[in-house]
Amino acid sequence: LGNRNKRMKIYFQRLVAVSVCFLLVFLGSNYSKAETVAPITLNPKDVEAFTNKVIPEKMKKENAAGVALVVVKDNQILFQKGFGFSDKEKNTPIDPKKTVFRLASISKVFTASAVMQLVEQGKIDLNKDIVNYMGGLKYQNNMSEPVTMEHLLTHTTGFDYVDPRPEDIHYQDNDYTMLKDYVEENMPTVVRMPGDTYTYDNFASMLQGYIVQNLTNSPFYKYMAKNIFYPLEMHNSSFVMTNFIKEKLATGYDAKGNAIPFYQTRPTDMPQGSMFSTGSDVANFMIAQLNNGKFKNNQLLQKETAEDMQKTKFALHPKYPNMTYGFEFFSPQSHNGQYVFGKGGNIPGFSSLMWLIPEHKIGVFVVTNKDSSALPVEVFDDFMNNYFPDKTKPEYLNPNEEELKKFEGVYRDLRLKNLMSHVNISEGKLYVSDKVYGKQELKQIDPLLFEDEKGNYMEFKLHKDGTVKEMIHWNSGSSAVKLSEPERFKDVDENHPYAKFINPLHQYEVLQANREGNFTPESSLTRAEFAYWLSQIAYFTPHSKKEPVFSDVKNHPYAPHIQKLYEIGILYEKEGEQFHPDRAITRQEAAWITWQYLKMLGAPSADATLKGETDDWAIESVKNIVGHRLVGPEVIYNEDGSADYLSKQSMKRQEATALLFYVLLSS
């Protein structure tokens, strides 16, 4: 169980790091191509001076063990250098030509390139249903339009779950998971119209690789070795671990500088993230992309294909595009008016970034053997400010209140589903508030584009019926959709003491009304209902399809959600133990389950003086719930800060909404 909890904690923190913290550095610029492109002077001596100044200070700040950087320009490697160590214990220096790193999501652009090769050969039609290329595998589609390869390449599939499972990082050397088996077992469901919304989509990139494998009758990693790595002379690159790669692989380190044990992935041959490579090898790929698909005498892609890959293919707003075929755009402001796209990668122990500026034939790749590091994107920011310092300040419009009304509402991020953005008008101005930045004024710079107080853009999408239902703010990795206002519970009026908890959770689709339209706030909550509500908040993994471990929940309607909490390490099962799903949950039981969840997410401990009676096994959990004040008005705090949590009482439904509302805000 210890390994399960540790793995889950690493998984969640990595997901958040990639989806939020990593993206926070990419805050802003206009991605439209510059009307005139002046040549930029870039020479090895100047780049070396720049990197020698910037990288060591960022390594010190980040406690990063090592960094490799490579810059290409005009179809050649202009500069490459290693900093620090690939193994601190052995003092092995980083060598950009020899040190192998895990590239994580940068793998996706290589996979997309393989897809485009098959498009050139006529084996794939970008606008045809992908089921035609899946070798008999099928996907459930709740919409009227099929998923196409275009949707896979632009991450606009409409899939319900797009990220890997916690157990996809594992420590079993001989555990080989076949790509086809993984895809078949974990196929998501299409729940939004394909092509309508953008969500960073790991499964879409994995499906691309599976389709390449299926159409070529070759294991994915072998196709990539023969058709991508070999013509690009990428001799130190692979999608699967080999002894040759393992010998050269840098040791990955966590945030505290501790070495991360060697691990494998599921599937083993993972198109969306298992690639290993060196700085020099990646440089050859960037050269081909910037040279009309050609590296030396080898034509990796036709000129037209390479150009097509680099064009904007999905944009919620023309000034804030999201995807090319395989590459992504970062948030606009930091690009200083240049047309820049690239790809970031983050996996335990490694963080990386590649960016291309095609009009200047410049490409840069930065990688560090440090977990969840902002170093690569900070180097990007400094690079752009140093070599492309011009920034154009936007001119603001002056809309009236009537023009702003269509933007009001609560928007839910499609990937980070606990991230809610509240957009509202106050005194004639538009504001947005969320749990990351708080409340900020939005200034309009275009009919559907705004800038917040920190300089981040917020773009909205106007639908054919004239309504606004979607936006992207600082989390450029996903659209956020406007939630409909549900019909209020008949038995919860606006003055109800728990209305401020119940109504938001109702709108967030955690709570549902009964047949009479009531919530029954003072009724006791069952253990199964509590597990279901918490499962809805634990958004980052789907409900389980496996046989429940608890014998008494096998036919229960909430069995998949109870099993999910077990699989992610929140619930435990002893041999022969039952869950008692329909028994009322006590407040100390709810506190214990909730604290397991919050600990898994890395919540700090909080102390509290407890009054009343609490069982020994629940004291730690209740202290933390009380100490963090994750309670409703039923808990009264004394002047000295102590409180009676009423631990042994049954938890009422209204009380559970207070607890889970605060959990949602903190997770």
What does each model-identified segment do?
Residues 69-76, 102-130, 152, 185-186, ...:
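Alpha-helical scaffold elements that line and support the substrate/ligand-binding pocket
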Residues 45, 61, 83-202, 216-218, ...:
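Active-site-proximal loop and beta-strand segments within enzyme catalytic domains
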Residues 20-26:
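Hydrophobic core
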Residues 94-98, 189-194, 205-206, 262-272, ...:
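Flexible glycine/proline-enriched surface loops and loop-helix/loop-strand junctions
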